[in-house]
Amino acid sequence: MASADDYFSDFEDDELDKLYEKAINKSVKETITRRAVPVQKDLHDNVLPGQKTVYEEIQRDVSFGPTHHELDYDALSFYVYPTNYEVRDYQYTIVHKSLFQNTLCAIPTGMGKTFIASTVMLNYFRWTKKAKIIFTAPTRPLVAQQIKACLGITGIPSDQTAILLDKSRKNREEIWANKRVFFATPQVVENDLKRGVLDPKDIVCLVIDEAHRATGSSAYTNVVKFIDRFNSSYRLLALTATPASDLEGVQEVVNNLDISKIEIRTEESMDIVKYMKKRKKEKIEVPLLLEIEDIIEQLGMAVKPVLQQAIELGIYEECDPSQINAFKAMQQSQKIIANPTIPEGIKWRNFFILQLLNNVGQMLKRLKIYGIRTFFNYFQNKCTEFTTKYNLKKSTNKIAAEFYYHPILKNIKNQCENYLSDPKFVGHGKLQCVRDELMDFFQKRGSDSRVIIFTELRESALEIVKFIDSVADDQIRPHIFIGQARAKEGFDEVKYTRKHAPKGRKKVERLHRQEQEKFLEAERTKRAANDKLERSARRTGSSEEAQISGMNQKMQKEVIHNFKKGEYNVLVCTSIGEEGLDIGEVDLIICYDTTSSPIKNIQRMGRTGRKRDGKIVLLFSSNESYKFERAMEDYSTLQALISKQCIDYKKSDRIIPEDIIPECHETLITINDENEIINEMEDVDEVIRYATQCMMGKKVKPKKAITKKKRVQENKKPKKFFMPDNVETSIVSASTLINKFLVNESGGKQLVTSNENPSKKRKIFKALDNLENDSTEEASSSLETEDEEVSDDNNVFIAEGQNGCQKDLETAIIRTGESLTTLKPLHNFERPNMALFVNDCGLPTKIEKNVKDIRGNQHNLEKEKSCTVDKNNMVLSLDDWNFFRNRYIPEGVSFDVEPNFVQYTKGVKVPHCHKVSKIITLFNDESNDNKKRTIDMNYTKCLARGMLRDEKKFVKVNDKSQVDNNSVNHDSSQSFTLSNAELDDILGSDSDF
C-alpha cells in the first residue's frame, strides 16, 4: 500500500518546470562552470572578508519547440517583398533578418523604417491563419502615419485591420476577436492585456515604433513582459533612429524587448549613403556680446566668496566663477542630502551653498546661450523671491543674503533694464544670425519653403518669434510651437506679502483686508483682460497667448495645418517638435541651442532631407560646440561597439519550422480603393476617422451635429484572466488539497476518497421534529394525519396584506362546545388615532358565512387589495375590517415579518393602547435579538403545540354553525407530552424557531 508521504509529495521537477515556464514552447538549459580563483588570506590562513574563492560561469542554452500558432503551410514556401517602391539593399537585408528573429532596426530618419515593418507584417499575415499582428506607436499622429504607410504598402484588406486608441472601449472585445491587424498605442495594448480582452497567446507579430522609449517601466516594457509570461512564439520588430545614448542604455532596450539582432545604419554606411538626400551642415560660432561679458564678470565677482567657501568645504570643484555649472551643483546637493553620516546642521549649510551655485549656474547658462532678455527674467524673479522672503523673516539663509544683497547685483539690474528699454536692442548674437539666415534662405528659395528653429526654453522661443517678426518683412511668417503645459508663473511679491502680513484681530481690519483682496483680484483680472486684448492686436499675439496658456492638441493640429498650407513658413519649436509629429517637409533646420544628448541632436537634424535636399544650421556659443562634438563622437563610438557585437542578445523563436526556408518573391502589390483613399489623406483625425469607419464596417458619412443619446447598457462580458496551460482555473477548496487516511482493522492507513469521506453528524432534537416550521399549513397537515375525520371540503382563503396573496387554509379547528368571541371595532371616525379595538382580549363574535360565500366574495378582495388605509387614516377600511372579523381563526394567524412600528399614533403623539404597546415591545425585542424574549417565546410555543397535539377530538366547521360570543374558554391546564429532559434540551439549544 502506498505510504502517506507518496500522497503528499511535491511535483516532479519536470512538472514544476512546466508550470514555471507557463507551458510555453521555450526551454532553457543552464550549465554552471566553477573555477577556483586565488584569494588573499591573513596570517592564520583565513580568507579575508569579501573575497570570492570560486568563479562561476553560467551558460544558458535556449531552445524552442513547435509554435502553437496555426500556420498556412501553402504560403510558407516564400515571402513577399513589395516592389511598389524602389528596392533598396539595406531594406531588403533587414526585412529578411527581421522575419526570422527579433530585430532592433536603427536607421536614420526618413530611410524607410515603416516599409520594413509593413513588409514583415504582411508576411506574417500570410503565414498565419488566425494570429494577431500589432503595430504600436506612442502618439496618435504616429499611429495615423503608420496606418497610411502600412495600408498603402501592403494592401492588407481594411476589413481585417483595426485602429485602437484610448478614447473609447466600445466593442473592444469584439474587435480583438474578429480582426487580425491592429494599430494602437502601447497604453491601449497594455490595458487590454491586463483586462483580459486580448489573449497574449494570439499575438504572432509585434512592431514597436520609437523603441528607444522602452526603458524602465514604460508601456512598451510592460507589454513585452506580459506577453512573455504566456507566449514565446512571436516576432518582435523594434524601430528607432537612435537606440540610446550609451552602451548601457542599448543593453537595457535589448533586454526589455528580447532583441536577438541589431541592424544599425548611419548616414555614412556604405549601403545607405547612396539613398541619402544631401544635408548640408553649417556650424556657426557666435561670440558673446560685450554687454553679456560685462554681466558675467559682475556675477562672478558677487558669487566668488560663496564659490570659494564651497571649494574649501570640498563640496564643489575648483573653477572660475564664470564656469559654474548648474547640473554639477545639483548633483552634489543630491549626494549630500542622501548621505546620512553628515550632521544635519552641516548638511543643510552645504545644501544651501550648492543651491545658490545652482541658481547662479542657471543665470550664466541663460546669459551665454539665450541672451540678456531670457537671463533678466530669471534673474529678477530669483532676486525678488529671496529678498521678499528674507525681509518678512521667512528665510534666514545668510549665505544667499550675502549674494542677493550684494551691491553689484543692483548695478546688474539697472544695466539690464536700460538695455531692454531700447526696442532695437538685440539680446544675443544668435538672434542676428537667425535673421540673416532666414533672409538669405527665403530670397533664394521663396516663401513656399519651410523652416524649423529648435530651442529648449519657451521664453527663448517667444523671443525668437518676436524678433523675427520685428525685423523681417511679410515674406517670413513665424509662429511658436510648444507643449500643452501652462507657463510657470513668476513670483508674485504683492500676493506673497499680503499672505504673510499680520491679519489683524478686529472685525474692521478683517473686513478691510477682504475688501482689499477683492479689489486687487479685480485689478488683476482687468489687467489680464487688457493684456490679452493688446496681444490679440499684434501679429505675434497667438504665439504670446500660446506661450502663457500652452498649446492643446487642437491648437497644435491647427498650427501644423497652417504650416503645411503656407500660412506660417517658420516654426519655432521646443522639444515637442523633435519627434512624434508629422510636420511635413522642411528645407532648413536651425538649432538655436544644442544638447549633450545625441538622440535629441539626431532627431532634430532628421527633420530635413527626407524627400529633398536640406540644410542644417548649428548655432554655437560658449562651450556648446564642444558638447555637440563630444555627443556625436560618443554616438559614433556606440555604433562601432554595437557593430562589434558588444551587446548580450536574447535568442528568439524562429516560428517557421527549421526545415522550411522561404524564398523571396518580389511582387507588385495592388492597393485597393479604400487603402488608396487612406494613403491620400493628410489630416490625422480624418485618417483615424476613416480607418475607424472601415473597421466597424460602416460607410463613411459626412460629419453631423453631435446629439447625446441615452446609452443602452450592454451586457458586459466577465473579465477573463489568462492562465498557464494545464492548470485548474476554478476555486479549489482547502479540503481537496490534502489526502485523508483512516486506520483500518489491520492497523494500516487507508486513503479516504471523496465518496467515503465521513461527514460529521448533526445532533437532532426529536422534540423539534414537529415544531420545525411555523406555517399554518404544516400545523394543519400534521393534525390531519392524526385524525382522518377532518373534512376536505372546508377550505378557507385568507387575504394577506396589500399583495392580495391567498393561502389555502385546509381546515379551521375548534373544540366541541367551545365558542369564539370577537373584537368589537370602535367606529370613532372623529378620533382615528385611538386604539382600533375596544376589547383587548376579545375574539371575533360570529362566523356567519360559509366557505362558498368566502369564495364568492374573492372578487371584492381583488378590488380592495390596494386600499389598506382609508380616508380617515384608520389602519383598515371598514369593509376590510368586517371581512377580517368574519374570517378570523386563532390557529390560522402567524407573523411572517417584523414590522417597524412607531411609538405613537399617526395623527398626534397619543400613546397606543396597552395591547398595541405590548406588540411593539415584542417586535422591538425580536429586532434587537433579545435572548430573554426569544426563550420566553420558545417556551410558550412549545406549550401551545403540545396542547394541540394532545387534542383527541375535533369538530368540523359547518356552514350553518354559529358560535356564541362569549363562550370561549381555553383550558390552559391541559397536559402536554414533552418531558422535562426534552424541554430543557430545547430551551437550552441555540434553535430559534
From Swiss-Prot:
The lineage of its organism: Eukaryota, Fungi, Dikarya, Ascomycota, Saccharomycotina. The keyword DNA repair applies. It holds the Pfam family ResIII. It catalyses: ATP + H2O = ADP + phosphate + H(+). It comes from the Eukaryota. It is found in: Nucleus. Interacts with the MHF histone-fold complex composed of MHF1 and MHF2 to form the FANCM-MHF complex. Interacts with FHK1. A motif (DEAH box) lies at residues 209-212. One of its GO terms (cellular component) is nucleus. Phosphorylation at both Thr-776 and Thr-785 is required for the interaction with FKH1. Residues 751-810 are annotated as: FKH1-binding region. One of its GO terms (biological process) is double-strand break repair via synthesis-dependent strand annealing. Residues 94-261 form the Helicase ATP-binding domain. This is ATP-dependent DNA helicase MPH1. The modification Phosphothreonine is found at residues 776, 785. It comes from Saccharomyces cerevisiae (strain ATCC 204508 / S288c). Residues 530-551 are annotated as: Disordered. The keyword DNA repair applies. Belongs to the DEAD box helicase family. DEAH subfamily. FANCM sub-subfamily. Disruption phenotype: Causes transiant accumulation of ectopic joint molecules (JMs). Leads to a defect in donor preference during mating-type switching. Does not affect FKH1's overlapping role with FKH2 of regulation of the expression of the CLB2 cluster of genes during the G2/M phase of the mitotic cell cycle. Its EC number is 3.6.4.12. ATP-dependent DNA helicase involved in DNA damage repair by homologous recombination and in genome maintenance. Capable of unwinding D-loops. Plays a role in limiting crossover recombinants during mitotic DNA double-strand break (DSB) repair. Prevents crossovers between ectopic sequences by removing substrates for MUS81-MMS4 or RAD1-RAD10 cleavage. Component of a FANCM-MHF complex which promotes gene conversion at blocked replication forks, probably by reversal of the stalled fork. Keywords: ATP-binding, DNA damage, DNA repair, DNA-binding, Helicase, Hydrolase, Nucleotide-binding, Nucleus, Phosphoprotein. InterPro entries: FANCM/Mph1-like_ID, FANCM_DEXDc, Helicase/UvrB_N, Helicase_ATP-bd, Helicase_C-like, P-loop_NTPase. Changing residue 784 to A: Reduces the interaction with FKH1. Changing residue 776 to A: Abolishes the interaction with FKH1. Residues 539-551 have a biased composition (Polar residues).
